[in-house]
Regions:
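Short gly/pro/ser/thr-enriched loop/turn and capping motifs at secondary-structure boundaries
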Residues: 80-83, 102-106
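Short, conserved acidic/polar surface loops in the N-terminal third of protein domains
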Residues: 55-56, 85-88, 107-108
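N-terminal organellar transit peptides
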Residues: 1-81, 94-98, 111-257
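Hydrophobic/aromatic residues within transmembrane alpha-helices
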Residues: 88-89, 192
Length: 257
């Protein structure tokens, strides 16, 4: 039976939406609920295709730190929670997905545009001055050498191994069985549950009820959000410039292709 509402009962709601490029907006909310509101539980609503490796790991670690303080964290997957977003989800106490949620995509991708042929056609050439053999690895102005390909593959392989190890540990999946689940393929929520990648199936309201129950709260406990940090026009413009810069430079990502 549902407990009666106790005045002051609250649960924190944190939303992770879109590509994961900057961890700070999400981590700021997590810290707020830990240090200011001191809530007993956080519902982490995820609708993201993944993103940068470092950013995903930053949020993953912050969720771990939140749980170490005794706060329950329930990950609720929306339309998509794949790759880096799945990495974040496995840090939670439990994961709930919709049957049709697109999740999984456990793997790493690094893409390097190559424009040397086009540049030659328009008569544009670059003089490169660098400090070491590999400093311009991934440059779009020339083809990639074989040793550079091997170097970058080693970076991708190690990053993938970190992801794989985290999944195996968090989901208690034997390494042998991980092979078939971590080739970058996507799964529906229902498939993911059958494979042990998520715990239960349900929507946002189901996850909210579960979070309240896990924290020992009544069904009427209030859902609260952290105050948003308003950015100035200059900060927003600077953020747009940074996004363009990241888009034009190479990075290793946990994301859908």
């Amino acid at each position: 039976s549902a407990r009666k509402l106790v005045p002051g009962e609250r649960i924190g709601l944190v939303e992770l939406t879109g590509a994961i490029t900057d961890p700070e907006p999400v981590n700021r909310q997590l810290r707020h609920f830990r240090d200011v509101e001191k809530v007993p539980a956080i519902l982490l609503r995820i609708d993201s295709p993944g993103g940068y490796v470092g950013a995903s790991q930053e949020i993953y670690r912050q969720v771990e730190l939140i749980r170490q303080r005794g706060i329950k964290v329930i990950a609720s997957m929306g339309n998509v929670a794949a790759s880096g977003a799945y990495y974040v989800a496995i840090a939670a106490d439990t994961i709930m997905a919709n049957p049709g949620t697109i999740t999984g995509s456990i793997g790493v991708i690094a893409e390097f545009p190559q424009a040397d042929t086009l540049l030659r056609k328009v008569g544009l050439a670059f003089n490169i001055v660098k400090s070491g053999r590999y400093k311009d690895t991934g440059s779009p102005t020339r083809p990639m050498r074989g040793d550079e390909q091997e170097l970058l593959q080693s970076v991708v392989d190690d990053t993938y191994l970190q992801f794989r190890e985290a999944v195996g540990k968090a989901r208690n999946i034997p390494q042998a069985r991980l092979d078939s689940l971590t080739q970058g393929q996507v799964f529906t929520g229902r498939m993911a549950k059958a494979f042990g990648l998520v715990d239960t199936l349900g929507n946002y309201d189901d996850a909210l009820r579960l979070a309240k129950r896990m924290a020992g709260l009544s069904d009427g406990a209030k859902v609260i959000r952290a105050p948003s940090a308003e950015k100035s026009l200059f900060q927003r413009l600077l953020g747009n410039v940074n996004d363009l810069w990241h888009a034009s430079s190479w990075s290793v990502s946990y994301r859908l292709p």
